[in-house]
A protein has these predicted regions:
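N-terminal glycine-/charge-rich "phosphate-binding" loop or analogous flexible N-terminal tail
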Residues: 1-67
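Phosphate-coordination loops involved in phosphoryl transfer and adenosine-cofactor binding
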Residues: 3, 106, 156-159, 243
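Phosphate/diphosphate ligand-binding glycine-rich loop within oxidoreductases
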Residues: 64-139, 153
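Oxidoreductase and adenylate-handling cofactor-binding alpha/beta cores
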Residues: 121-137, 178-181, 313-326
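Glycine-rich NAD(P)-binding loop of Rossmann-like domains
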Residues: 138-171, 200, 206
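Conserved beta-strand positions in the Rossmann-like core of class I SAM-dependent methyltransferases
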Residues: 184
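Rossmann-like adenosine-cofactor binding region
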Residues: 189-287
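Rossmann-like dinucleotide-binding domain for NAD(H)/NADP(H)
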Residues: 243-245, 249-338
């Protein structure tokens, strides 16, 4: 029986985490005796840093690979891996692959959609509670050693509008419902109401402004595609309540940041919680750093202590399907972009 060559390229190349990749490689190898796994993580980082000879060494591994499991992969992957048939990324979002040579190729692309729902759902609630309970104000008063009393808000009976009802959007809806909130959402198709169990009002994507106008919190949980790039701009901010906050845990490019800054300056909205920005890291001279009503986190909402295990569990489940000729989970529709 012919061997199946798998190349792993993970971000877990830190010398302080020597067990990370070893555990991943062992787990993948245990799926089948046919599997032959090699680790290209260190070489991929070396190539990124421009270290001499690293590209040639990585090319030797890529040339053998039929399957690649990883993150931060080379943009010319298809050209360098002629035997490649399937790539599974360790992320849910696949927008970075749209500029690689596998996007318009027969190579199957899958992601790990679903594993982020719990940590990101909690992160969204954290943002909402911080705004409702005025946590940024509390932190500033503590730093100034000031005892300034204020009136906190509550989430109960407030309306949350979720833009995008995938696994993350559905988990946000479930958590918000537990807080006694009214839940609205938009999605491309409203033909599957069973997927909207915790949603009080489901709207097609074309009725976004209605959702914006009724929401106290707007949560961006849609992938970045040609359709959603710049989805939230000046007109959308004008449609929002001046007391509403926007939270983005999708991709930075979904929000027009210049329009967001103008909306904050004009007090068209009450605040923004941003785990993602158009440029990452956020440039030091960005004005977004300086607003009292903007909470910034460095694209970490999807993280959790055992992230790599969850991601690799899903890859191994897909690997079993691949070996048995079954349809893979989380196959990316390259025309739609997710």
């Amino acid at each position: 029986v012919e061997s199946l060559n798998i190349l792993v390229i993970t971000p877990a190349f830190d010398a302080s985490l020597p067990q990370s990749n070893e555990a991943i490689l062992r787990q993948i190898s245990s799926v089948s005796p046919r599997v032959r796994v090699k680790d290209g993580s260190v070489l991929a980082v070396a190539e990124f840093r421009g270290e001499p000879g690293s590209r040639e060494k990585l090319d030797a591994l890529l040339a053998e690979a039929e399957v690649i499991y990883g993150l931060f992969l080379p943009r010319d992957l298809r050209a360098r891996a002629p035997r490649l048939k399937w790539v599974q990324t360790m992320s849910a979002g696949v927008d970075r692959f749209a500029t690689t040579d596998i996007w318009n190729s027969p190579v199957i692309l899958t992601g790990v959609s679903g594993i982020h729902a719990t940590p990101i759902g909690e992160f969204v609630l954290e943002f909402m509670l911080m705004f409702a309970k005025k946590a940024p104000f509390c932190f500033r008063m503590q730093q100034k050693h000031e005892w300034a009393r204020f009136m906190p808000g509550v989430l109960r009976d407030k309306t949350v509008g979720i833009v995008g009802l995938g696994s993350i959007g559905r988990e946000v809806a479930r958590l918000c419902k537990a807080f006694g909130m009214r839940v609205m959402a938009t999605r491309r198709s409203v033909k599957r109401p069973a997927r909207a169990r915790y949603v009080d009002k489901l709207l097609p994507a074309g009725q976004l402004k209605q959702l914006l106008g009724e929401s106290d919190y707007v949560v961006i949980a849609t992938p970045l595609t040609a359709e959603t790039n710049g989805l939230i701009g000046a007109d959308e901010f004008k449609a929002m309540k001046p007391t509403a906050c926007i939270i983005n845990i999708g991709r930075g490019g979904i929000i027009d940041e210049a329009a967001l800054i103008r909306a904050l300056d004009a007090r068209q909205i009450a605040g923004a919680g941003l785990d993602v920005t158009a440029t990452e890291p956020l440039p030091p001279d960005s004005r977004l750093w300086d607003y009292d009503n903007v909470i910034l986190t460095p694209h970490v909402a999807g993280g959790m202590e055992d992230y790599m295990k969850h991601a690799t569990d899903l890859f191994c489940k897909n690997l079993e399907r691949y070996l048995n000729g079954k349809k893979l989970l989380n196959v990316v529709d390259k025309d739609r972009g997710y």
